[in-house]
Amino acid sequence: MKKRLLGIALGSLLFTTGSAVAADYKIDKEGQHAFVNFRIQHLGYSWLYGTFKDFDGSFTFDEKNPAADKVNVTINTNSLDTNHAERDKHLRSAEFLNVAKFPQATFASTEVKKDGEDLDITGNLTLNGVTKPVTLEAKLIGQGDDPWGGKRAGFEASGKIRLKDFNITTDLGPASQEVDLIISVEGVQQKS
């Protein structure tokens, strides 16, 4: 009887731990359910907002084991859009993002840690030919089945970068030394 109970307990344990495995997701950019946005102060008087319209990426998510989570994103820096063509041209120039020489920015996570209900995602951001560690604070918005028979998970993340850290040395004034990153992604779980 004891062996039977032990077998049932072990079987239950294996079943429950087996169901909590990491799942791979592709960022849903085709459905326009993902955004890589930024904002920077303009002269300390207002916020200037922008977005990158062309990017791709994936993430691995295991709610029970954040150490297994991974994030990889590639951004086409030429897709920068601040809703002002002349400003966009200037931001794409060698004074700022130098998109002719560095057409892509990348983020690859190196560590994911639980922080209360949120996640701290640390990784290497490569921008303007410079790679630096960056930490993003992320929040799970929701996860579950979608109407098309798949599964989805969505996150919002935020962080800050200093322009000088990425060799962007144009002086925009003391209020404009940092850029806020505002990221919202929805991922479609990939079938194994």
Curated annotation (Swiss-Prot):
Its keywords, alphabetically, are: Periplasm, Signal
Give any Gene Ontology cellular component: periplasmic space
The lineage's top-level taxon is Bacteria
Q: Where does this one sit in the cell?
A: Periplasm
Main subcellular location of this protein, as a coarse class: periplasm
Q: Which Pfam families match?
A: YceI
**SUPFAM superfamilies, alphabetically?**
YceI-like
- Signal peptide from the UniProt entry: 1-22
- InterPro entries linked: Lipid/polyisoprenoid-bd_YceI, TTHA0802/YceI-like_sf, UPF0312/YceI
PANTHER family attached here? PROTEIN YCEI
HAMAP family associated with the record = UPF0312
What does the similarity note say?
Belongs to the UPF0312 family. Type 1 subfamily.
Name of the protein described by the UniProt record: UPF0312 protein Ent638_1570
